[in-house]
């Protein structure tokens, strides 16, 4: 499955547009990890735990979007966009949404 942020695929012709597809992932924050991240914010440095969670959420959202496209018979998803939103009381959750247009490519 080809996933691209562009609206065309170089060297390939889009035969049919199948519809908009989405994938979402919501991850909750861990209290201990939050505390360690706050300490890192004060002393500087990157939060590896948060980066890993963000990467996992992004990969999950993209995989769900690709699966939705497969169910429509798509060969690719063009115009892929990723959105990030903080949710929950105390902003304790992160939602990652992937969206794009499922397409069938000409042979």
From Swiss-Prot:
It comes from the Bacteria. Signal peptide: none annotated. Gene3D superfamilies: Hypothetical protein apc22750. Chain B (3.30.110.70). InterPro entries: UPF0145_dom_sf (IPR035439), UPF0145_YbjQ-like (IPR002765). Belongs to the UPF0145 family. PANTHER family: UPF0145 PROTEIN YBJQ. This is UPF0145 protein TTHA1256. It comes from Thermus thermophilus (strain ATCC 27634 / DSM 579 / HB8).
